[in-house]
Amino acid sequence: MKNIRNFSIIAHIDHGKSTLSDRLIQTCGGLSDREMEAQVLDSMDLERERGITIKAQSVTLNYKAKDGETYQLNFIDTPGHVDFSYEVSRSLAACEGALLVVDAGQGVEAQTLANCYTAIEMDLEVVPILNKIDLPAADPERVAEEIEDIVGIDAMEAVRCSAKTGVGIEDVLEEIVAKIPAPEGDPNAPLQALIIDSWFDNYLGVVSLVRIKNGVLRKGDKIKVMSTGQTYNVDRLGIFTPKQEDTTVLECGEVGWVVCAIKDILGAPVGDTLTHQHNSATEVLPGFKKVKPQVYAGLFPVSSDDYEAFRDALGKLSLNDASLFYEPETSTALGFGFRCGFLGLLHMEIIQERLEREYDLDLITTAPTVIYEVEMTNGEVVYVDSPAKLPPLNNIAEIREPIAECNMLVPQEYLGNVITLCVEKRGVQTNMVYHGNQIALTYEIPMGEVVLDFFDRLKSTSRGYASLDYGFKRFQAADMVRVDIMINSERVDALALIVHKDNSQYRGRELVEKMRELIPRQQFDIAIQAAIGNHIIARSTVKQLRKNVLAKCYGGDVSRKKKLLQKQKEGKKRMKSLGNVEVPQEAFLAILHVGKDK
């Protein structure tokens, strides 16, 4: 056991985690050169296309160190985006140490900090690594100082490497062996295995990634899931070398995968403990704290026949992504669907794309909203995650919106732009610290503004140099109103949105204009209105298509023309009272982009 090292690789987006993992795998001979490819751990098509890591992946490697011993390295490559920070915290729970990878050109960024603090809170040994030293812009000395100054861990000894060219990879491995402690645990105690992650395989059922804390797990053992008390037979188990490789036993301290032919998706929840059926452990291992979704949106299948398939797909996906929340919802405009909770907009996009690709569904998404705390006049407090559920105005005493605490690291030259942006988003500055050329800004900004497009705007206003990390702080009373969109004086529930009163007029007008461009012209006028309660704040009209009824009477008598026009007008009036308007899919997505173009 003393030769096992469990660690995660944490870093900001694009600081080279996945490339470093590639090099480690190559150096330790996990894959032959023929099977090696760039970012070999990002196995999902989506990850390869976007060039980001979404799922944490684990690998077991054998490394023959300079002291002649062979060490077993179990490492987990983690995502860098703030939306997937839950994946990171789960991965860290299975480790004794973490490699903090910092780009020697970019320096410390917000996510570096956030992930590093998560690791320190879990009592992990953090080993700083300066990556990308082959870049012309690299300045390892300055960055090492930055790490000491901002993060507060000793970085003068930090290993310098370049994952792309392979310089210094040996040093990284030696550093891992030297600095990261071996796992603690008793191989003779009753089995305790923590489920770190699980996914659904159509042939094998539920596959779980586990970390053995105490005891030993063998093929053929009878095991029990501690939260449900159900027992299963271990059919297969093994490790990832990135390929799934079968073994007969998982020793104490190891990380590996287990298949027990569990057909039920809720059979082995993430964060649960596995133990032996007969000699079972008494205590459950501390799991993970549940994360609360920050953004809610309705997802509806385009054709209602897909509803069952959609429900199964969500079940299988939520097994793999423990931070996804969903409950059934109906909408008069869109039929049956689900209200889903996500950790952020990127998470929402990814989930929607995975559903459409992996499960072959066509989906419509409604506008994302955050969760609001509403105090009723009778003193009751309700939580509202969709504009349709907002109680009538005369029953509401006050609406409180969620406030996010945003930590940003900004280079000095972009400070002005970033502050302007934060003020525009109704932010309040709470802290500002200078670290050399970087400035650490802390703002309290309403969550609704942060999730919408704050991240994109922050990146574009600072040419990509500013970085952001945010978390929910508290609820705070605000003057929020619900803007309803009416088409031919019928409310379309899927288009409603909750906004701050100051922005309501502008958002309403912009949305109505956008809808006018997207709804196809019909044979009659379509009135599109935005309303707060019964008060109309904006309107625009999609003009009707009309036939030229006067074409056939050349000169002709004016009363004849009047008669024809009058007849057309009556026909249009009748059509308008009977006609209904089809709202195209693009119109629902228009809400997402209101306020983006300016």
Swiss-Prot record:
Membrane topology: Peripheral membrane protein
GO CC terms: plasma membrane
Protein localization: Cell inner membrane
Gene Ontology annotations of biological process type: positive regulation of translation
Superkingdom: Bacteria
The tr-type G domain, residue ranges: 2-184
Assigned EC number: 3.6.5.n1
Xref: CDD domains: EF4_II, EF4_III, LepA, lepA_C
Gene Ontology molecular function: GTP binding; GTPase activity; guanosine tetraphosphate binding; ribosome binding; translation elongation factor activity
Enzyme class, first EC level, given as a word: hydrolase
InterPro entries with a match to the protein in the record: EF-4, EFG_III/V, EFG_V-like, EFTu-like_2, G_TR_CS, LepA_C_sf, LepA_CTD, LepA_IV
Catalytic activity: GTP + H2O = GDP + phosphate + H(+)
Sequence positions that bind GTP: D14, H15, G16, K17, S18, T19, N131, K132, I133, D134
Keyword line: Cell inner membrane, Cell membrane, GTP-binding, Hydrolase, Membrane, Nucleotide-binding, Protein biosynthesis
Cited PANTHER family: TRANSLATION FACTOR GUF1 HOMOLOG, CHLOROPLASTIC, TRANSLATION FACTOR GUF1-RELATED
Main function: Required for accurate and efficient protein synthesis under certain stress conditions. May act as a fidelity factor of the translation reaction, by catalyzing a one-codon backward translocation of tRNAs on improperly translocated ribosomes. Back-translocation proceeds from a post-translocation (POST) complex to a pre-translocation (PRE) complex, thus giving elongation factor G a second chance to translocate the tRNAs correctly. Binds to ribosomes in a GTP-dependent manner.
Family: Belongs to the TRAFAC class translation factor GTPase superfamily. Classic translation factor GTPase family. LepA subfamily.
Protein name: Elongation factor 4
Organism of origin: Haemophilus influenzae (strain ATCC 51907 / DSM 11121 / KW20 / Rd)
